[in-house]
């Protein structure tokens, strides 16, 4: 068990992991394809609601070098990254490798700690060497910039964990009202953010059937099949 996974057993960790699990459960089930991989926090199954045929969790299922993954280019339909990048010495390099293995129009879903929040303030104040406070929290705007540079388009996202990061459960319960109020009154100050991003490739356009106005204006099949005769002059 990693230090972060041990922290998830604490009251504040459980407060976070319940919301993370709910978000991943809701979003991975809507992604279609054949191959899904979870990179990070291997002690929790964030792919459990995915309907893909092959689901791999780095750690219990497969030991991975995140900088050189044993997947073919463009072979992954969904990559889930729970708190992977903020505990890496080279997060942008990992993102480059993920961009390589994800197929065009494939998706990544990631979570990260928000440095511009009460949780970020605690990290600065404590200067702890324990996870998660020792991590390099990456801002939401910087993460979006990195994704855009690699050709990913952010399609959805949200923040959560607006309550102060108390270690005691009684204090978390007293500030539970902030969770519902946060989305309305201070939506960018949640302690944790989620992003869903789609890999876009220049020049690639999905062809969809056109059942709109052109189909409505087309003549009936019976008219098309009728023999046509010329009038004699």
Where are these regions (language model features)?
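Class I SAM-dependent methyltransferase Rossmann-like catalytic core
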Residues: 1-29
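Class I SAM-dependent methyltransferase SAM/SAH-binding core
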Residues: 22, 26-72
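Hydrophobic beta-strand segment of the Class I
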Residues: 76-80
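A short glycine-rich, Lys/Arg-flanked "PGG" loop and its adjoining helix->strand segment in the class I
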Residues: 92-107
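Conserved class I S-adenosyl-L-methionine
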Residues: 107-137
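Short alpha-helix
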Residues: 125, 134-157
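Conserved catalytic loop of SAM-dependent methyltransferase domains
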Residues: 154-179, 188-189
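C-terminal lobe and adjacent flexible extensions of AdoMet/dcAdoMet transferase-like proteins
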Residues: 177-233
């Amino acid at each position: 068990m990693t230090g972060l996974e041990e922290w998830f057993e604490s009251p504040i960790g459980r407060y976070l992991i319940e919301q993370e699990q709910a978000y991943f459960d809701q979003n991975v089930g809507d992604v279609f394809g054949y191959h899904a991989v979870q990179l990070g926090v291997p002690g929790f199954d964030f792919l459990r609601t995915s309907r893909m045929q092959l689901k791999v969790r780095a750690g219990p299922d497969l030991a991975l070098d995140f900088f050189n993954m044993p997947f073919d280019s463009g072979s992954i339909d969904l990559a889930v990254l729970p708190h992977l990048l903020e505990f890496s010495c080279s997060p942008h390099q990992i993102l480059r490798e993920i961009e390589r293995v994800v197929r065009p129009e494939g998706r990544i879903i990631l979570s990260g700690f928000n440095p511009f929040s009460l949780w970020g303030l605690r990290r600065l104040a404590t200067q702890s060497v324990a996870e998660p406070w020792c991590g390099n929290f990456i801002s939401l705007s910087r993460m979006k910039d990195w994704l855009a540079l690699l050709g990913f388009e952010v399609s959805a996202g949200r923040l959560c964990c607006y309550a102060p990061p108390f270690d005691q459960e009684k204090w978390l319960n007293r500030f539970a009202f902030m969770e519902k109020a946060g989305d309305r009154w201070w939506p960018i100050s949640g302690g944790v953010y989620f992003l869903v991003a789609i890999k876009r490739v220049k020049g690639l356009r999905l062809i969809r059937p056109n059942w709109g106005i052109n189909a409505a204006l087309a003549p009936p099949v019976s008219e098309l099949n009728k023999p046509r005769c010329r009038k004699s002059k």
